[in-house]
Amino acid sequence: MATMILRDTHRALEQKMKELEKQKKETSIKIREAASHGDLKENGEYHAAREEQSFIVRKTQTLQTHSPFQIVEYSEIETDEVGFGNKVSIYDEVKEETKEYYLLGPIEFELDTFPMVVTYHSPFGQAIIG
C-alpha cells in the first residue's frame, strides 16, 4: 500500500535525500582521511565519522521504508470529515485546553515539516479519522 504524502512534502523529501547523499559522500571522505592517520583503535576522528555515517544511512533507510508514495495535492484533501491532510482541534477536558494536530503521514512526521503531526497510521490517528 502506498504511503500518502503531500506534494510539498514529497519535494522536501527529494531535497532531503539529495542532502543525505551529499553528506554520505562527505562523511566517506572524512573516514578515509581519518583512517590515513594510523591506528584506528584510538582514532576519535575516525570513530566520530563512522558514527555520523551510520546516522546518515539509518535516516536514509527510514525515509525509504515508506515508499512507494501516493502524492496528494492540497485541492484533493477532503474537509467534510477528518482524514489525511486535515488540521484537527481536540479539546482536553482534564486540562481544559484545545490542541491542534495535523493528520498526515510518516514522512511529514520524520521530516518535521508541520508542528504537532499525528500520523494516520498511529492508533491516535486511526481513532480520529472519520
PLM region spans:
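Non-DNA-binding regulatory cores of transcription-related proteins
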Residues: 74-130
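Conserved, well-folded catalytic cores of nucleic-acid-processing
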Residues: 23, 34, 63-70, 127
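Short, charged/polar low-complexity linear motifs in solvent-exposed/disordered segments
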Residues: 30, 65-66, 117-118
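A short linear-motif detector with a strong N-terminal bias
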Residues: 11-12, 25-26, 66-69, 79-83, ...
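Internal alpha/beta loop-helix hairpins
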Residues: 44-76, 80
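General N-terminal targeting signals
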Residues: 22, 48, 57-58, 63, ...
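N-terminal cationic and glycine-rich segments that engage phosphates or anionic surfaces
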Residues: 1-58
